[in-house]
Amino acid sequence: MTRLLGYVDPLDPSFVAAVITITFNPLYWNVVARWEHKTRKLSRAFGSPYLACYSLSVTILLLNFLRSHCFTQAMLSQPRMESLDTPAAYSLGLALLGLGVVLVLSSFFALGFAGTFLGDYFGILKEARVTVFPFNILDNPMYWGSTANYLGWAIMHASPTGLLLTVLVALTYIVALLYEEPFTAEIYRQKASGSHKRS
């Protein structure tokens, strides 16, 4: 880690922008989704929980594009690491990127659009929590797929800055999950409890 830090200028504007977007994005969608779950104000404003969810998803996607752009610019503005600048490392990065894409896309198809973009906070619930691939091989595959994408991208660019930012991506997801997992579990517990009472 100390060796990586020697390549990184933490005051570089591109690096600062990447750090801000990486940490802001999960905070944004968690705060907005919980506020919606508590107040239903977005659903009322848009006249439908589906429209509200889709509108939030647009902002999340735009923020994710911005995060990826800032991540890439931060890598390009700082030195490459010679020991990573090899065909073998590039191939490893490409494989990680491919794995990440598979996890992200398969998660999206398993969850559906609303499920991917916090639909459960809008009252758009599935019959039960999703357990098909890739959820049957690991928890939170969307987040780990995204992390693999960034890790692969960083290795392909032989970028110590990218590796450090990937660690930050993983840490922000871990912190987000500390809030999201119990909350989602409680939403589905309440749904199951309500179903039992009606039956």
From Swiss-Prot:
Residues that bind S-adenosyl-L-methionine: 98-100, 180-181
Stretches within the membrane that do not traverse it: 13-33
One GO MF term: phosphatidyl-N-methylethanolamine N-methyltransferase activity
A Pfam family: PEMT
Post-translational events: Isoform 2 is N-glycosylated with high-mannose oligosaccharides.
Reactions that this protein is recorded to catalyse: 1,2-di-(9Z-octadecenoyl)-sn-glycero-3-phosphoethanolamine + S-adenosyl-L-methionine = 1,2-di-(9Z-octadecenoyl)-sn-glycero-3-phospho-N-methylethanolamine + S-adenosyl-L-homocysteine + H(+); 1,2-di-(9Z-octadecenoyl)-sn-glycero-3-phospho-N-methylethanolamine + S-adenosyl-L-methionine = 1,2-di-(9Z-octadecenoyl)-sn-glycero-3-phospho-N,N-dimethylethanolamine + S-adenosyl-L-homocysteine + H(+); 1,2-di-(9Z-octadecenoyl)-sn-glycero-3-phospho-N,N-dimethylethanolamine + S-adenosyl-L-methionine = 1,2-di-(9Z-octadecenoyl)-sn-glycero-3-phosphocholine + S-adenosyl-L-homocysteine + H(+); 1,2-di-(9Z,12Z-octadecadienoyl)-sn-glycero-3-phosphoethanolamine + S-adenosyl-L-methionine = 1,2-di-(9Z,12Z-octadecadienoyl)-sn-glycero-3-phospho-N-methylethanolamine + S-adenosyl-L-homocysteine + H(+)
A GO cellular component entry from the record: mitochondrion
Record keywords, A-Z: Endoplasmic reticulum, Lipid biosynthesis, Lipid metabolism, Membrane, Methyltransferase, Mitochondrion, Phospholipid biosynthesis, Phospholipid metabolism, S-adenosyl-L-methionine, Transferase, Transmembrane, Transmembrane helix
PROSITE patterns the UniProt entry points to: SAM_PEMT_PEM2
Gene Ontology biological-process entries: blastocyst hatching; methylation; phosphatidylcholine biosynthetic process; positive regulation of cold-induced thermogenesis; sphingomyelin biosynthetic process
Cytoplasmic-side segments: 67-93, 179-199
Entry superkingdom: Eukaryota
Listed pathway(s): Phospholipid metabolism; phosphatidylcholine biosynthesis
Signal peptide: none
Known tissue expression: Primarily expressed in liver (at protein level).
Transmembrane regions listed in the UniProt entry: 46-66, 94-114, 158-178
EC number in record: 2.1.1.17, 2.1.1.71
Family annotation (InterPro entries): PEMT/MFAP, Phopholipid_MeTrfase
Activity regulation information from UniProt: The first methylation is rate-limiting.
Lumenal side of membrane: 1-12, 34-45, 115-157
Family: Belongs to the class VI-like SAM-binding methyltransferase superfamily. PEMT/PEM2 methyltransferase family.
Stated name of the protein: Phosphatidylethanolamine N-methyltransferase
Gene: PEMT
